[in-house]
């Protein structure tokens, strides 16, 4: 059976998949597929929202790289719902001991 080669620390939901990789300096990478969001305006809006959520909630506290993969249902979320989703994902990673 095929086993995907995923990093040790990750969180998956129907809206996003969040990976954490130890690295220096801290960074945030966001991937929004053109397949799911045809217009560049929509892709850029989602990226701006995610960056703002990480910045406001001070989620990049330590060393490491966060990689966020965005799925189609994320585009339908309100800003507050998206914020709650991302904060929960990062908190679950911190609880796993990153």
Predicted regions and their residues:
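Positively charged, solvent-exposed patches that mediate nucleic-acid binding
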Residues: 1-98
